[in-house]
Swiss-Prot record:
ATP binds at S11, F12, H19, G91, L92, R93, E101, H126, L127, Y128, I129, S130, S131, S132. The record marks H19 as: Transition state stabilizer. This is Phosphopantetheine adenylyltransferase. The gene is coaD. It comes from Streptococcus pneumoniae (strain Hungary19A-6). Its main location: cytoplasm. PANTHER family: PHOSPHOPANTETHEINE ADENYLYLTRANSFERASE. Substrate binds at S11, K43, V76, R90. Its EC number is 2.7.7.3.
Length: 162
């Protein structure tokens, strides 16, 4: 029997404790879980890709079966095929997330019918945490320590120094 390989993607700009919770839970479901940082090279991100990748690798270092990868200008299903992943993992906070994700699931299934999407519901304590919300708090100088892993906080602080 072949290994169960999953792929969880996002921009992780920045990674939140909600992302971390989904990744930790998903890592128990798969032999190998890839965490893919997907980004649009034509958009200005909050944190540079290198900082995001380094922060995620530190935050996920305790998970032996998890590997962080980065991609741009590629479809998720193409990256999944390249990595041998047959499952896409998505986190859901609310009904709006489900509706948003359902359209991607439709297209992904059209492009690769052998790849399934697995949905994990956010824990109640993470329902209202989002990367955009964290960026908004930072914009106004607010403390975000309770919303992001320590390694992400370090990357944000280091980026502000530069």
């Amino acid at each position: 029997m072949s290994d169960k390989i999953g792929l969880f993607t996002g921009s992780f700009d920045p990674m939140t404790n909600g992302h971390l919770d989904i990744i930790e839970r998903a890592s128990r479901l798969f032999d190998k879980l890839y965490v893919g940082i997907f980004f649009n090279p034509h958009k200005q991100g909050f944190l540079p890709l290198e900082n995001r990748k380094r922060g995620l690798e530190k935050a996920l270092g305790h998970l032996e079966n998890v590997e962080v990868v980065a991609s741009h200008d590629k479809l998720v299903v193409d990256v999944a095929k390249r990595l041998g992943a047959t499952f896409l993992v998505r986190g859901l906070r609310n009904a709006a997330d489900l509706q948003y994700e359902a359209s991607f699931d439709y297209y992904n299934h059209q492009l690769s019918s052998d790849i399934e999407t697995i949905y994990l519901h956010s824990r109640p304590e993470h329902l209202y945490i989002s990367s955009s919300g964290v960026r908004e708090l930072l914009k106004f100088g607010q403390d975000i320590a309770c919303h992001v892993p320590e390694s992400i906080l370090e990357e944000i602080r280091n980026e502000k120094k530069d």
